[in-house]
Every structure is written in structure tokens, then in C-alpha cells.
Amino acid sequence: RKLNVDLIVRHNGGHQAAHNVVTPEGVRHCFSSFGSGMLIPGTKTFLSSKMLISPDSFLNEGEILKSKGVTDVFERTFISDNCPIVTPWHTMVGQMLELERDEARHGSCRMGVGQAVYDSDAGRALLVKDLFGYEKLVKRLTEIFEAKKRVAAGILKRSLGSTNAAKLQATFNYFTTERNVSAVFDRYRKFSALVGFRTVLDQQFLAGDYKTIIFEGAQGALLDREYGFAPYITKSKTTYHNAKALLDQSRAGVQIH
């Protein structure tokens, strides 16, 4: 409020962020998929290509914010065409891997962000722009679903007789039935219909006329995949690198604090 910020840019991580805000009026919200200034009227959020998006979490949190009086939360949110998507099956694999580790677990948030980063780094990411061609989307979702089922089946096989075998099977059953391709497709159609005309390219959107931009990360520096302490790290860069890369693309000569 004091800086008259008009744009908040998310530049790393995904919906595992948990940024608690309390307004002077007593409104409370824990932000995960939106910029933490959205309780301030007029402030915009930009989800850059450096952030990963869970359409489910985005839609759910948006409805919660609307119930708290932020009725235009979706209208004030803009998304990069090239944001990678965190699917429920990334979440399935992430949860099952952490269960398999048992006492050697890493402390994962188990939301699938790390698994989606792996796919993005390997050039296999499902991107926001891929959600708008429905026939192609069904094909891509089916490919991801089958690939993650194979990974999950391997975890189940390795874990037969283990203390977490029943939990692993229950996790697999839920994500392959309740979160099947048809259910996820319907949810993603709702997401794409809602945000379609507000999807943009990083450099075009960030080159706009803004007074003050805040770049909001998702984790602390000691979780950075290069500078943190393995294995207790996230899979993405948590320092200023992504923010600087975005600025270098679009706002040469900008004053940085």
C-alpha cells in the first residue's frame, strides 16, 4: 500500500506458496496462486512463465477470494502463455515418492510442483497455451496420465509389503479414478474459458506502463536447487535470478531496489 504497487509478478514455484496477509480491516488470506496484494483494489497479478500453475488450485483460491470481497480477482489476474501446468498426476507421483521414502522423506509439500519442474526441464511440460485446443489437450492429458501411471505402478511394485503400501495404493486409486482424464479435462476447460483473453507473453505484459512492480517468490534462498542444502531443496530457482531474467527481456534500464 505504501509503495503504490500496481503489479505483482510471481516468478518461481507454484501453488505450494503460503503467504499470509491480514488487512487493516481484518480480512485474512493465505495466498498461493495469486500475488499477495490482491486484497488491495486495483492491484494486478501476473503469473509469469517462471511460475507453475495448478488450474484446480487457481480456481479454488479465486472463489475463496471472491467470497472475501475480491469479486474481480480473476479479471485482475493475467497469465503467461508459457506457464507450465501442474497436473493431478504430478501430484500423485510426488505424494507417492514421499510416502515411499518413509523415514528418509525430504519434507516435500507433496503438491506435484517438483514433478512438473522435472517435466518442464525435460521439454515435456503441458503449458497454459496448450489448454485451448481441446482435441490436442485430450491427447496430451492422456499421454501424461499414462506416463505417470507407469511411474506410480513402479513405486507400488517396489513398495509391496512396506509400512506405507496401503497408503500408496489408496493414493494411486484416488488419482487414477477420481482425477481421471475426463475429470481433469472438464476442469481445465473451465480454467481456459475463464482466463483465455488474459493470457499473454511475458515480455509484452511486463513492458506495460507500471509505477511499481513487486516480484514475489515462493520459497526462501536456502531451498534453491543450486544454493540450498540437498536433498532438502525445491526443484526451482528461489533467488532473484528468474525476476532478473524477466526484467532483462522486457524492461531495459528499469530501476531495481
Question: Model features per residue range: what roles?
Answer:
Residues 1-257:
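Non-transmembrane, aqueous-exposed alpha-helical and coiled segments at domain scale
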